[in-house]
């Protein structure tokens, strides 16, 4: 099993980078976690619907250039399914038993993800009804991936 994250934009905050690196390190004995950043689009001062669509399509194209046919694509979106940590771990385990071995999580930029990219995803996943900065979402996702692996392996971490 391998986890991939394709995310729009670069993280500048050192505390987020350190947290993500810590969970990547913790995951190494179990699985790989590859994080790929794609360039975010420059947002115009006034966002009209046409400009929003243009930005979303630009970012969609950059994301798609990093995907492969082997990817089981899970797009993070506020409209997605919500799980408990245990249910999320069970979903990952069940999909693995079905033969899925590469999970690719997509995190959009400031404007989220295009509708067409969300439709093409195998699953839409929401961590909360709250809106989080996309940079922080990477840290939350990597922690939940580590938690899911520990649950799957029946090892202490999640209580």
UniProtKB/Swiss-Prot annotation:
It is found in: Cytoplasm. Its main location: cytoplasm. One of its GO terms (molecular function) is rRNA (pseudouridine-N3-)-methyltransferase activity. InterPro entries: Alpha/beta_knot_MTases (IPR029028), RlmH-like (IPR003742), tRNA_m1G_MTases_N (IPR029026). Transmembrane segments: none annotated. It comes from the Bacteria. S-adenosyl-L-methionine binds at residues 76, 108. Keywords: Cytoplasm, Methyltransferase, rRNA processing, S-adenosyl-L-methionine, Transferase. Coiled coil: none annotated. The keyword Cytoplasm applies. The keyword rRNA processing applies. It catalyses: pseudouridine(1915) in 23S rRNA + S-adenosyl-L-methionine = N(3)-methylpseudouridine(1915) in 23S rRNA + S-adenosyl-L-homocysteine + H(+). Its EC number is 2.1.1.177. GO terms for cellular component: cytoplasm. PANTHER family: METHYLTRANSFERASE (PTHR33603), RIBOSOMAL RNA LARGE SUBUNIT METHYLTRANSFERASE H (PTHR33603:SF1). Specifically methylates the pseudouridine at position 1915 (m3Psi1915) in 23S rRNA. Homodimer. Belongs to the RNA methyltransferase RlmH family. This is Ribosomal RNA large subunit methyltransferase H. The lineage of its organism: Bacteria, Bacillati, Bacillota, Clostridia, Natranaerobiales.
């Amino acid at each position: 099993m391998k986890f991939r994250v394709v995310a729009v934009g670069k993280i500048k905050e050192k505390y987020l980078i350190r947290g993500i690196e810590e969970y990547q390190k913790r995951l190494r004995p179990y699985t790989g976690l590859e994080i790929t950043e794609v360039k975010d689009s420059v947002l115009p001062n006034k966002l009209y619907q046409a400009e929003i669509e243009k930005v979303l399509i630009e970012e969609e194209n950059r994301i798609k250039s990093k995907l492969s046919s082997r990817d089981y694509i899970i797009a993070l979106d506020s409209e997605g399914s919500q799980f408990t940590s245990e249910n999320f771990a069970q979903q990952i385990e069940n999909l693995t038993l079905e033969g899925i071995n590469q999970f690719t999580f997509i995190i959009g930029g400031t404007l989220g993800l295009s509708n067409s990219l969300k439709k093409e995803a195998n699953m839409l996943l929401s961590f909360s009804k709250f809106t989080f900065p996309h940079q922080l979402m990477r840290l939350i996702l990597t922690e939940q991936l580590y938690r899911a692996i520990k649950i799957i392996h029946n090892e202490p971490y999640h209580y």
